[in-house]
Swiss-Prot record:
Stretches of the chain found on the membrane's Extracellular side: 1-195
CDD domains per the UniProt record, alphabetical: LGIC_TM_nAChR (cd19064)
Claim: Hydrolase is one of the keywords in the record: no
Family matches, as SUPFAM superfamilies: Neurotransmitter-gated ion-channel transmembrane pore (SSF90112), Nicotinic receptor ligand binding domain-like (SSF63712)
Glycosylated residues (UniProt): 62, 140
Cytoplasmic compartment segments: 281-404
Protein name (Swiss-Prot/TrEMBL): Acetylcholine receptor non-alpha chain
Disulfide-bonded cysteines: 89-103
Main location: membrane
Amino acid sequence: IIDVHEIDQIMTCSVWLKQVWIDKKLSWNPEIYGGVSVLYVPYEMVWVPDIVLYNTVDSNYNITISTKATLRYDGQVTWDSPAIFKTLCQIDVRWFPFDEQNCHFKFGSWTYTEDLLNLELLDSDARYELEMNENGELNNITIFEEGIDLSDYYPSVEWDIMSRIAKRRTKNYLTSFSDEAFIDIIFYLELRRKPLFYTVNLVFPCVGISFLTIVAFYLPPRSGEKVTLCILILVALTVFYLLLKDIIPATSIALPLFGKYLLFTMIMVSLSVLVTVISLNLHFRRPSTHRMPIWVKWLFLRILPKILFMRRPTLIKVDEAVRRVADYRRGYNMIINRYEQKVNCDSCRNVNKRITQEIQKIYRSPHVIKAFENVCFIAQLLKKKDREAMIDEDWKFVARVLDRLFLLLFSIACFLGTILILFQAPSLYDTRQAIN
């Protein structure tokens, strides 16, 4: 096997075609001719059957390599002709790169019908079956399990030969006179691709790139590289698609196995871009622009964190003393009374009375009231910022929960998708040994 060109669907093989027939006109008596029993003559000098390769894609149907034929005294003619055949081989890309192909060589006479030329295989055990022809009639066919001699076969670096069946059958062809029967012999080659090259250079890199999609959900939103990573993965997969286009034929019969995996990976990456955009949108939401719905709080702040084993970090709260200062308008009198009680005692009632009056003057002065109002404003501002910070942290935590959720979902999807798509090729479970 020289080459199997998938795009052009052509198989090129170098073969030895051995043909043996009896020509009584070429027999002689060796005793009369000095004991000569074998002659070697150019094949052009003797009659040769017009055996042609029906499914060739070359312009020459006949064998054109000039070799000599062997003539034996009893009229047996043996012609071993080396040739390079280019045959049409319909490529089945469904399981690429773990595919198996069935190619064949169809030989037969172009001129002589069944009555004039009989074709048989040499030295091979045969079995007989019935096959239905185009007219719905049953014809006898002869099947040879070892139809091709592989004793001098040079193993291909890309393909293994799994079987080499030959079939002899009779088929009717419409000629200029009538519908006449011709005998043809078809040699079938079942080839299984050696997947190591494409596994290392295509499958493994693509699997690695697809699992990089999971890393995008592990990046913190503040890094700003989540969408960039997803887009780069998408570009890398596009390059793999271009490589695949140059390897397999442009057929619409079936989608290649590797193409299915690439399509699955591109869908996953596209979804990851969408989810990443949603996650970034949630992360950078502010209380002034968005109000968190109740169901979002219930689902993303209570239920999912427990399922995903996530713990929310403790927030730094405003000091309680500042909160009490914020309640100045409501508890201002309580503050004054508290300080008045501190300076009241029975032993120094007169002095305390004077001190209390001074304290009341101080606490009720416009400057002190203004200072308390300013402190109250600052406290309210701190309370508002603290509340907004808590809501802001809620949105960020929702984004983290969403990332963790899709990190888990995409990990499961990528793993199961890789197993279910790539491991469905039948050749991976074919335990037959290749024919060496």
